[in-house]
């Protein structure tokens, strides 16, 4: 059968429109394109497109009227304020609203003159016509069906035009529109499926982060705050037009990947033992053993009293009253020293300050200064394990526990590399795994150097460190002022741990102020000399 040139041209035009629609990734713009293509194919003067929402209502997404110069929703800056149309009224299908009836019945409704169309309620259209002087006449309403034949939306076209005359929508136009609508519905469904899958994956990532935060009230919120700070830094670098990173620009796709990476950056901690994550004191295991040490010191205190008491009794028997007074002073001095030693151990157990060599030696001295009898065995008041834990230089974790914590990145690596990320999320693993790497290659889990890491991977380390330093929910330290946080980070830059260019932008753009105001105490923002903190070139 020979196809007429006009039909061939129409077919090719329809195909071209369909291709354009299939490439659109923004659902709002996609729906607008479907509507505008329908208006063009039918030569309609006006039209609206609706999407079925979760409340079982038809929600306006784009409204267009050529004669009135009206364009709402979609790419327009004008928002739609019209109320959604319920599909059901009193639990029964809404058959008075024509768009609802088309959705509920799955039927195409072609009306020559809406003023004569019963039983549909066109009172709103009449009222609007009276106010505007417009005349709503012919109308074509048809549902958009997905691959399972479910209704995903409705298109309503108003006033087919032939020159300046309003005519009816012909059967030929109706068939053309339905053919196109099927393609449009498929494109819309595909985009909705992709969007829903992405929402599901992002929600899953956030759920994992929430579960990890819930493991410890002392670090709770870390997995939530890091992604937000990461994006704040990324936006600052994107906008910064000076220095080595002046040409760095973050696409929407890369920004989305960085957001997902932020939520998943510590996912390996789900396998880290709770008592290690929760370790808020140096002697803590399942419980804080400082109470056990205190009990042993109480025994030592009792032993001092008993030993001196025995000496006093012996002196009294010999009538040496002067010696008794000396023994009383001896007991007083010994007990005072014991209380000082106890207070010292309680303080260093917190782990909030760097432990000096002198303090470490003091722990060993205290350990041998007092002996007690336990299980018929005479022993030092502190065990080797207790000495080792109390002697941790910084924080509360000993070497073995720190190794366990670091292994969370191995678990994170295994989890993320096992996930079959689609192309548009291909960089998530690389971004997420960068926050414990260092510029000199001495970090973990892969020991990468700066040149082997992308900018997003390197900036996540800045976010991770600043969040940890500025946090007020760590039990072993109070919230640090910004100046102290940045000074510590500046030293990390000097030691080739953090990226100097990213740190410079972080400081000069004052990202820390925005973050502190949102997630911490504004009182932490203090005065300091920015130039003294910035790395020297």
Regions found by a protein language model. Give the residues of each.
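GAF sensory/regulatory domain recognition
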Residues: 48-93, 116-117, 288-291, 296, ...
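Signal-transmission linkers at sensory-effector interfaces
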Residues: 1-33, 37-41, 62, 193-207, ...
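Divalent-cation-assisted or electrostatically stabilized phosphate/pyrophosphate-binding catalytic cores
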Residues: 168-172, 208, 278-303, 385-416, ...
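Helix-loop-beta substructure at the N-terminus of cytosolic sensory domains
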Residues: 23-74, 92-98, 219-220, 227, ...
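A short, aliphatic-rich beta-strand micro-motif
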Residues: 137-146, 153
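Signal-transducing coupling segments at domain and membrane junctions
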Residues: 94-100, 107-108, 112-138, 160-170, ...
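Amphipathic alpha-helical "output/dimerization" segments
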Residues: 13, 150, 165-189, 256, ...
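Signal-transmission/dimerization alpha-helices at domain junctions
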Residues: 104-108, 154-155, 163, 176-197, ...
């Amino acid at each position: 059968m020979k196809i007429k040139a006009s039909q061939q041209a129409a077919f090719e035009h329809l195909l071209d429109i369909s291709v354009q629609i299939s490439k659109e990734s923004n659902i709002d713009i996609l729906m607008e394109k479907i509507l505008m293509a329908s208006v063009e194919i039918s030569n309609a003067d006006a039209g609206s497109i609706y999407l079925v929402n979760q409340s079982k209502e038809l929600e306006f997404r784009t409204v267009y009227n050529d004669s009135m110069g009206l364009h709402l929703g979609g790419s327009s800056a004008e928002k739609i304020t019209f109320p959604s149309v319920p599909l059901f009224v009193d639990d029964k299908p809404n058959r008075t609203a024509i768009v609802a009836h088309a959705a509920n019945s799955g039927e195409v409704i072609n009306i020559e003159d809406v003023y004569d169309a019963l039983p549909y309620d066109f009172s709103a259209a009449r009222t609007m016509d009276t106010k505007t002087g417009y005349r709503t006449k012919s109308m074509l309403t048809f549902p958009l069906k997905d691959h399972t034949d479910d209704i995903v939306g409705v298109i309503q076209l108003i006033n087919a035009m032939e020159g300046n005359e309003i005519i009816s929508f012909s059967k030929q136009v109706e068939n053309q529109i339905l053919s196109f609508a099927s393609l449009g519905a498929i494109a819309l469904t595909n985009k909705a499926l992709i969007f829903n899958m992405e929402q599901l994956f992002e929600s899953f990532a956030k759920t994992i982060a929430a579960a990890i935060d819930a493991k410890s009230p002392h670090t709770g919120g870390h997995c939530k705050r890091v992604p937000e700070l990461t994006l704040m830094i990324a936006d600052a670098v994107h906008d910064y037009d000076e220095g080595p990173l002046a040409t760095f620009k973050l696409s929407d796709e890369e920004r989305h990947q960085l957001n997902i990476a932020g939520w998943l950056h510590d996912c390996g901690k789900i396998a880290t033992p709770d008592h290690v994550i929760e370790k808020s004191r140096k002697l803590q295991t399942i419980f804080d053993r400082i109470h056990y040490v205190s009990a042993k010191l109480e025994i030592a205190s009792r032993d001092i009293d008993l030993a001196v008491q025995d000496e006093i009794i012996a002196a009294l028997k010999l009538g040496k009253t002067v010696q008794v007074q000396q023994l009383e002073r001896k007991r007083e001095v010994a007990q005072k020293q014991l209380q000082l030693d106890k207070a010292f151990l309680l303080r260093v157990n917190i782990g909030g300050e760097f432990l000096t060599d002198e303090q470490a030696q003091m722990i060993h001295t205290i350990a041998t200064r007092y002996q007690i009898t336990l299980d018929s065995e005479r022993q030092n008041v502190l065990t080797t394990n207790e000495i080792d834990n109390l002697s941790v230089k910084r924080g509360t974790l000993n070497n073995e526990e720190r190794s366990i914590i670091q292994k969370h990145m191995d678990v994170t690596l295994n989890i993320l590399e096992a996930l079959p990320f689609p192309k548009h999320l291909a960089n998530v693993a690389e971004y997420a795994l960068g926050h414990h790497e260092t510029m000199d290659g001495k970090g973990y889990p892969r020991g990468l150097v700066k040149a082997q890491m992308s900018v997003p991977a390197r900036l996540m380390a800045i976010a991770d460190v600043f969040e940890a330093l500025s946090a007020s929910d760590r039990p072993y330290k109070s919230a640090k002022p910004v100046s102290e946080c940045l000074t510590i980070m500046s030293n990390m830059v000097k030691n080739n741990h953090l990226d100097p260019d990213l740190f410079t932008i972080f400081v000069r753009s004052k990202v820390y102020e925005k973050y502190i105001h949102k997630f911490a105490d504004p009182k932490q923002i203090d005065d300091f000399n920015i130039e003294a903190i910035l790395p020297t070139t």
